[in-house]
Swiss-Prot record:
Record-listed ATP binding positions: 123-130
UniProt GO cellular component terms: HslUV protease complex
InterPro entries: AAA+_ATPase (IPR003593), ATP-dep_Clp_protease_ClpX (IPR050052), ATPase_AAA_core (IPR003959), Clp_ATPase_C (IPR019489), Clp_protease_ATP-bd_su_ClpX (IPR004487), ClpX_bact (IPR046425), P-loop_NTPase (IPR027417), Znf_CppX_C4 (IPR010603)
GO molecular function: ATP binding; ATP hydrolysis activity; ATP-dependent protein folding chaperone; protein dimerization activity; unfolded protein binding; zinc ion binding
Family: Belongs to the ClpX chaperone family.
Function field: ATP-dependent specificity component of the Clp protease. It directs the protease to specific substrates. Can perform chaperone functions in the absence of ClpP.
ClpX-type ZB domain: residues covered: 3-56
Top-level taxon of the source organism: Bacteria
Assembly and interaction partners: Component of the ClpX-ClpP complex. Forms a hexameric ring that, in the presence of ATP, binds to fourteen ClpP subunits assembled into a disk-like structure with a central cavity, resembling the structure of eukaryotic proteasomes.
Record bears the keyword tRNA-binding: no
Record protein name field: ATP-dependent Clp protease ATP-binding subunit ClpX
Binding sites annotated in the UniProt record for Zn(2+): 15, 18, 37, 40
Keyword vocabulary terms for this entry: ATP-binding, Chaperone, Metal-binding, Nucleotide-binding, Zinc
Length: 425
């Protein structure tokens, strides 16, 4: 390395890029037969930074330029999610407006558009998580699912709310620009409700305290995340992620919310306009669409958090017909998945309508909704999938209502058309 000062007897050295001599610059760094000065190094670094920033912006702009319309979003949701028409319509509009807002962020305007996060209310297995997953896949943005019940306030045992952003970064290879336009789905948000609608004087590390921590994340903050998933410790460089433009979708079953709504409506419905139906006759799916912010506060969510979730969509409990549709109609329907698994063995799978109905009824009895369909079907096909690789000449497996109810094993059809019961020799 050549210093600026030198004796007159020294050979004068020059930067190979700008041509300045060693006396005109602070430092001159030598390589194999070449030299570069500190000024050229600074210029190179500046060019690299500018080009990297420009490429990130171009990539983000390209990703936003093909934003689907609400109708297109709804049509895509229809391919994977059965029923819940009103919820899909609300989500399509909310997501379209959110990413349309991001598309115009760089433009100067007198009107500043606020972010509209989403709250999904519906029973277990009604499609809340699937809706959020499908939206993220359609929009090709980073997506993460967080379980609110595992979160605690900072400093307590459990997951810090900023771990959510860390997982989002992991899902996009730590590209901060991509993560800042992602979607976060927070499940079981109802499980962190405070125990009463009055502020508590005692510490509630997994309830109201977590709501307060989530509030900062949802409304927009600079989250500090350790690089490449490391643990937080002093004197460490953190990745700074701005959560202002991340779309947060919160979901929960909110068991008992319908009672809160009915109590309110019964107080205001006295007289000729009162509800004719009794409380027992009014189904939760009928009552939940009437949810007001005051009901959610009574349930245990803090007012500030409710204010940051202005878009509310309610999902209804799936009936037998809807569950039967879910088994066969979506792109990734369960019946199609198991048919493909058996086709890999060269065997056709036939599930008769009576069996589909029996699966749906069993899921309703278990109160698991669509989430419980796979376990019922898996249980019915377990013996067949275990024995099938050892059988020769099986052409078709037939599942009927008796198989689902456990009264008879699946029927195996052989090449010579001789039916055989699975498990028999």
């Amino acid at each position: 390395m050549a210093d600026k000062k030198g004796s007159s007897s020294e050979k004068l050295l020059y930067c190979s890029f700008c041509g300045k001599s060693q006396h005109e610059v602070k430092k001159l760094i030598a390589g194999p037969s070449v030299f570069i000065c500190d000024e050229c190094i600074d210029l190179c670094n500046e060019i690299i930074r500018d080009e990297a920033t420009a490429s990130e912006k171009d990539a983000a702009a390209a990703a936003r330029s093909d934003l689907p319309t609400p109708h297109e979003i709804r049509e895509s949701l229809d391919q994977y999610v059965i029923g819940q028409e009103q919820a899909k319509k609300i989500l399509a509009v909310a997501v379209y407006n959110h990413y349309k807002r991001l598309k115009h962020l760089g433009k100067k305007d007198d009107v500043e558009l606020s972010k509209s996060n989403i709250l999904l209310i519906g029973p277990t297995g009604s499609g809340k998580t699937l809706l959020a997953q499908t939206l993220a896949r359609l929009l090709n943005v980073p997506f993460v699912i967080a379980d609110a019940t595992t979160l605690t306030e900072a400093g307590y045992v459990g997951e810090d709310v900023e771990n959510i952003i860390q997982k989002l970064l992991q899902n996009c290879n730590y590209e901060v620009e991509k993560a800042q336009r992602g979607i976060v789905y927070i499940d079981e948000i109802d499980k962190i409700s405070r125990k009463s609608d009055n502020p508590s004087i005692t510490r509630d590390v997994s309830g109201e305290g977590v709501q307060q921590a989530l509030l900062k994340l949802i409304e927009g903050t600079m989250a500090s995340v350790p690089p490449q998933g490391g643990r937080k410790h002093p004197n460490q460089d953190f990745l700074q992620v701005d959560t202002t433009n991340i779309l947060f979708i919160c979901g929960g079953a909110f068991d008992g919310l319908e009672k809160v709504i009915m109590q309110r409506s019964d107080k205001t419905g006295i007289g000729f306009a009162a509800q004719v139906k009794s409380k027992e006759e009014r189904d939760a799916s009928e009552v939940l669409p009437q949810t007001e912010p005051e009901d959610l506060i009574k349930f245990g969510l803090i007012p500030e958090l409710i204010g940051r979730l202005p878009v509310v969509a309610t999902l209804s409990k799936l009936d037998e017909a809807a569950l039967m549709q879910i088994l066969v109609e979506p792109k990734n329907a369960l019946v199609k998945q198991y048919q493909k698994l058996l086709a890999m063995e060269g065997v056709e799978l036939e599930i008769r309508p009576g069996a589909l109905s029996a699966i749906a009824r069993k899921a309703i009895r278990r109160k698991t909704g669509a989430r419980g369909l796979r376990s019922i079907l898996e249980q019915s096909l377990m013996d067949v999938m275990y024995d099938l690789p050892n059988y020769k000449g099986v052409q078709k497996v037939v599942i009927d209502e008796n198989t689902i109810n456990g009264d008879a094993p699946p029927l195996l059809m052989y090449e010579e058309q001789q039916p055989k019961v699975a498990g028999s020799n």
